[in-house]
């Protein structure tokens, strides 16, 4: 790669999930302990004014974090933030994407070494192109690992 600035603007291959189902919501409820009936009880959700049950916000945030950590490694993540934008409904297909917004020498920290601090803009959209959750993440990765990922992404593009 041609210097740290050569990473900025690089988009990684997206990953799609779904179509998501009510069963996915119930599985997530079991894992998270969020048993709000809006997410699994159709009559309850409709009575509350919704057209159907819908996903917990953290469901799609979890998909986005899973996507990001598959790219650059769970052990390398240093920061992850999200903003919820739209609800996710049964039948939605979600697509996660990431773009590098910054890459700089990591500094003098004990775990810095030859590492780069890499910032990503993250987005999860539905099949209509609406952003359901957006976010950002910061990773500490080696330049070699980032180059290898960039090369692999170029091959699959």
Predicted regions and their residues:
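Hot-dog-fold acyl-thioester-processing enzymes
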Residues: 1-76, 144-157
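Mid-chain, well-packed structural core segment of small domains
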Residues: 70-96
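HotDog/MaoC-like acyl-thioester-processing domains
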Residues: 1-11, 90-157
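Hydrophobic small-molecule pocket/channel-lining residues, especially in calycin-type beta-barrels
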Residues: 45, 87, 132
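A generic structural signal for short beta-strands and their flanking turns/coil linkers
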Residues: 16, 24, 76-80, 94, ...
């Amino acid at each position: 790669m041609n210097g740290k600035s050569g990473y900025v603007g690089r988009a990684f291959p997206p990953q799609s999930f779904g179509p998501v189902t009510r069963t996915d919501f119930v599985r997530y409820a079991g894992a998270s302990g969020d048993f709000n009936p809006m997410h699994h009880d159709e009559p309850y959700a409709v009575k509350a004014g919704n057209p159907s049950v819908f996903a917990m916000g953290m469901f799609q945030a979890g998909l986005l974090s899973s996507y990001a950590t598959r790219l650059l490694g769970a052990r390398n993540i240093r920061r992850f933030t999200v903003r919820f934008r739209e609800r996710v409904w049964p039948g939605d297909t979600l697509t996660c994407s990431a773009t590098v917004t910054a890459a700089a020498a990591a500094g003098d920290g004990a775990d810095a070494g030859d590492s780069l601090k890499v910032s990503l803009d993250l987005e999860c959209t539905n099949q209509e192109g609406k952003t359901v959750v957006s976010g950002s993440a910061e990773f500490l990765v080696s330049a070699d690992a980032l180059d290898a990922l960039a090369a692999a992404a170029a091959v699959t593009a």
